[in-house]
C-alpha cells in the first residue's frame, strides 16, 4: 500500500485536514511532465494521497545510498564482508526524530538474520513544522506577495531541512 513498514512509524502522524487537501488539489500540477522531469516511468507511494500530498504533507523514508564490497572498475567474485546504507526520513509535525530513529533501529535489528552484525547510527534530526496560514506573519507575507505580483500565492507545504523552525515556534 506504499506505506513505510517500520512498526509505529505513523503513530503520531495527524491526518491532513480536508480543507488543506482541497487547496493542494487546486495547485496546477502536471504529473506527466513531473515524471519526465525526474526521469521515471511511474510514481508510487502511500495510497490514498496525491503526488503533491506525498511530497509535502506525508512523512517519507528515503534511501540515500547503498554500497559495499568492491566498487572499482571491472568485476570481482569475492563476497563483501560489509555493506552500508544511508537513509533519511522526512518527518511531519508531532513525529519525534529520536523516537523514529529508535523504531527504525529496533525494526532493522528485528529482521536481520542472527548471522550478521547490524549497527544503526543516528546522525541528526529535527522536528517537523507547518506554518499556520492563519498566522499574522503568514497573512502579511501573503498580502505583500499579492501586492507585488497581483495575485494570491498558493499555500504549499515543502519538506526541507530547516529544523530550527520548530524551535522558533516554541
What is each PLM-predicted segment?
Residues 1-169:
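Metal-dependent amide/peptide-bond hydrolase catalytic core
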Amino acid at each position: 500500500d506504499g506505506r513505510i513498514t517500520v512498526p509505529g512509524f505513523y503513530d503520531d502522524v495527524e491526518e491532513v485536514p480536508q480543507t488543506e487537501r482541497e487547496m493542494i488539489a487546486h495547485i496546477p500540477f502536471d504529473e506527466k511532465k513531473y515524471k519526465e522531469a525526474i526521469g521515471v516511468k511511474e510514481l508510487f507511494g502511500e495510497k490514498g494521497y496525491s503526488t503533491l500530498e506525498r511530497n509535502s504533507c506525508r512523512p517519507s523514508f528515503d534511501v540515500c545510498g547503498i554500497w559495499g564490497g568492491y566498487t572499482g572498475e571491472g568485476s570481482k567474485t569475492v563476497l563483501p564482508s560489509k555493506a552500508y546504507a544511508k537513509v533519511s526520513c522526512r518527518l511531519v509535525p508531532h513525529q519525534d526524530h529520536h523516537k523514529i530513529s529508535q523504531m527504525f533501529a529496533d525494526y532493522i535489528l528485528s529482521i536481520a538474520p542472527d548471522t550478521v552484525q547490524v549497527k544503526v547510527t543516528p546522525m541528526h534530526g529535527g522536528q517537523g513544522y507547518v506554518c499556520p496560514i492563519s498566522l499574522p506573519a503568514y497573512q502579511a507575507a501573503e498580502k505583500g506577495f499579492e501586492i507585488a505580483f497581483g495575485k494570491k500565492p498558493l499555500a504549499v507545504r515543502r519538506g526541507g531541512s530547516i529544523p530550527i523552525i520548530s524551535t522558533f515556534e516554541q
